[in-house]
Amino acid sequence: VLSTAAVAGTEYEILMETYAGHYYPESPDGGCATGPVLPGSYQDPLEEGRRRTLGVCTFGIWNEDAYQLWMDADTLKQVLDKLDPNSLRAAKIAEALENFTLAVDFEQDEAGRIASYRAGREALKPALEAKNGSTTPVFYAVGNAHIDLAWLWPMAETHRKTERTFAAQLRLLEEYPEYKYIQSQPAAYEMCRKYYPELFQRIKEAVKDGKWIAEGAMWVEPDTNMASGEALIRQLLYGKKYYKEEFGVDSQMLWLPDTFGYTAALPQILKSCGVKYLVTQKIFWSYNEGEQFPYHYFYWEGMDGSKITSFLPTSYTYRTDPSELIGVWENRSQKRDLDAFLLPFG
């Protein structure tokens, strides 16, 4: 959004940075391309057939009233679709949505439309303000960005991708004071510090203000099966040192959403390095037709008896709309001893 209070005649200069596509083509079955891009294997510009083209650019006039009305109505419609149609809540939401359709008139002039949008929101307000009961689960939602440091693009693009992601999140933290964002990988932070020092200073301020959560314990988000115990300890040594020196944070949580495996030595290694918690989730994605993992919240006991408190969401790319949240809860593996759920979205 260029402006939420634009004045007629104002001119804007737009600078656009784009990435023209991955070096590797899509797989024959249409799935994700393979990687990573090895040093020296990347041709810039890409040869014909592997080059993407920006073909269409559009713009529109932002109407905050219309957007908020759409959000309200869509939220209630998604909730309604998931409810027992015989429930009182379903009846109340259906009534509110009907009243909304009677209040809104899209055929009026601009002033009339805006007035009707606001009347429509008032019609939906009672249903949106209804309180949940005492047996409703709690979701702890936090923004995150899982940045692959080396996958389908050259390292130079990782630098730019990191900068774009961090800058966008800082803007969101300013726009939404209640928003919290978590970011792992000191390796990514170090790229930012080296190539975008002013941006890095803004991140440090956001960490100090409690808006940006600098956590993760390890230097990167590594595989834990191929790496030796010494390599994993080094990950923790350098990772925790960086968090402490740059952000004043004693990192106590291993944030490992996208690893492909877990060594049985991990609880012992984490405990010995002062890490108390583990968050991961790929076990729900890559089970190769095996039996579904039965828990989300549990103690993982290592070979030496060390215990790590662990929480496994089923994704790190959740949406935050009602249908997603209700679906996450209904499809959870652990049906008992669980009344709250971590929801990393982004």
Predicted regions and their residues:
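Catalytic-domain carbohydrate-binding cleft regions of carbohydrate-active enzymes
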Residues: V1, V7-G346
